[in-house]
Each structure stands twice: as C-alpha cells, then as structure tokens.
Amino acid sequence: MRGEFGIGSAAQYGSADLKKAVHVNENFRRANFTSADMRESDFSGSTFNGAYLEKAVAYKANFTGADFSDTLMDRMVLNDANLTNAVLVRSVLTRSDLAGAIIEGADFSDAVLDLPQKLALCKYASGTNPITGVNTRVSLGCGNKRRNAYGSPSSPLLSAPPQKMLDRDGFCDSETGLCDAK
C-alpha cells in the first residue's frame, strides 16, 4: 500500500504524460500532478483529496463524479473538461481556465476562484450535486448579492463584512451600533 501512513497514493505524476489515460475510480489522494499532461484522460469517480494539480493540463478530460476536496488546482487548464457531479469543496482554482467546462451538478462550496472565472461559470451553472446535495449555482454564489458584494476568499480584505467599528477613543460608535463592547 503506497502513501503516507498507508492512507493515500502520494504518487508522483509531476510532468507525466497521461494523455488519453484511463484511471476510473482510483485513489489519487495527496498525489502530485504538477504540470502533468492529462488531456482527454478519463479520471471519472476518482479521489484527489489533498492532491496537487497546479499547472496541469486537463483539456477535455473526464472528471465525472471525481472528488477534488481540499485540492490545489492553481493555474490548471480545464478547458472543455467534464466536471459533472464533481466535488470541488475548498479547492483552490486561482488563475485556472475552465472555459467550456461541463459543471452540471458540481459543488464549488468554499472553493477559491477568480471573480471573472466565477462569473463566467455562473452564466451556465446548473444542477445539484448528488453526493453533497448542494446546488451548483448556490455553491458558486451566483446571484447572491451579499456574497458578490464582498468578493471571494481569494480577496481576504473583501471576503467578509466589515469589522465592528470603534470610535477614535476605542469605544463603540453609539450612532451606528457596530460595537457590542462597553
């Protein structure tokens, strides 16, 4: 059994040529796919928890039902990839390209996406993830004025409502009621 403490693959696929490979329902937990060429491969039903896929190219790859929870997918190319019913909870997808990706039923809850990419996905996002029960549009924050107003987790200064304000002497502002301290 490979991997750290026998609980994952921890396999090294960095810069590997995986074009048109078939790895259905496999465990790639904590594996390294940095800069791997995964074009037109089939990874449907596979688990990638905690894996590294930064700069990987997965053009037209099939990730139907794959679990990408807590995965680093920074600068990944996912053009025309099939992410139907995939779980991308807490994944980091900054500077990744998902143009034309099929995301029906995908769960992006707490995932970090660039705002332009998120807005592009919201134009056609649909479905509900059968594993988590979360609606794809809800997980992306589509149409949520409050969430859009504060940005995304990738913008920490804008990702939460403003902190409670104190006046210049360190006391609560009684006019706005923004502080509970006495």
Description of each model-found segment:
Residues 1-182:
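Tandem repeat scaffolds
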